[in-house]
A protein has these predicted regions:
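Cyclophilin-like peptidyl-prolyl cis-trans isomerases
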Residues: 1-218
Length: 218
């Protein structure tokens, strides 16, 4: 005899609600959140990658020194922008035309932008700050070398001169003196003078970046 046949109420238990529905809802929310997070990460990564590629590009090189393009009757100045401030340099274009032309060409081509001052010597006595090396360790060059231009200009305080590894090995590296360095006269070609930013020069540290170099022609 069934329980219904004896007049008693059915005692069939109600099935408890499955927890799977709640668990799936939670998992779904977590999955959506995870996908959103991954999407954000991918966006950031793809935004950064182009910049990383730019940083890893090989430095510019050239097969020969640039042709003469400056007008030696005009006055040329360069503004080197750094995070510490600007250095303004006046060139001796009429006296040292080949080297000034070389610097102007490289600067206008963006060669120096992003390079560093890889050598800063102030101790035991003020000496020089040197930059313009495409490798960043003082061994780089633009792919060519050219002869010295030794003139009556000497290494006074703030002199802009070409760094080299011996006679007639000029390329792209340059230095600016913190104090007179006349023992360098006749060995390095002075081609300009710092006219603004000595305080900036004194604050520079090894590794400071040359943001850009702008050439002004008058």
């Amino acid at each position: 005899m069934s329980r219904r046949d004896d007049g008693q109420k059915s005692t069939r238990r109600k099935k408890p609600k499955s927890r799977q529905t709640g668990t799936w809802s939670t998992r779904k929310k977590l999955l959506i959140g995870l996908c959103a997070a991954i999407g954000v990460v991918l966006i950031v990564v793809f935004a950064i990658i182009p910049g990383l590629k730019g940083d890893s590009q090989s430095p510019k090189t050239y097969s020969a020194p640039p042709p003469m393009t400056i007008d030696t009757s005009k006055q040329y100045t360069a503004t080197i922008e750094t995070e510490k401030g600007d250095l303004v340099l006046e060139f001796f274009a009429s006296d040292v035309p080949i080297i000034v032309n070389n610097f102007v060409f490289l600067a206008r081509d963006g060669f120096y932008d992003g390079l560093t001052f890889h050598r800063v010597v102030r101790e035991p006595s003020p000496f020089v700050v040197q930059g313009g090396c495409p490798i960043g360790d003082g061994t780089g060059n633009p792919g060519y070398q050219f002869d010295d231009e030794i003139t009556e200009h000497t290494h006074i305080t703030g002199a802009l001169s070409m760094a080299n590894s011996g006679p007639n090995t000029n390329g792209c590296q340059f230095f600016i003196t913190y104090a007179p360095q006349h023992h360098l006269d006749g060995k390095h070609s002075v081609f300009g003078q710092l006219i603004e930013g000595m305080d900036v020069l004194e604050r520079l540290e090894q590794g400071d970046v040359i943001i850009r170099v702008t050439i002004d022609e008058k």
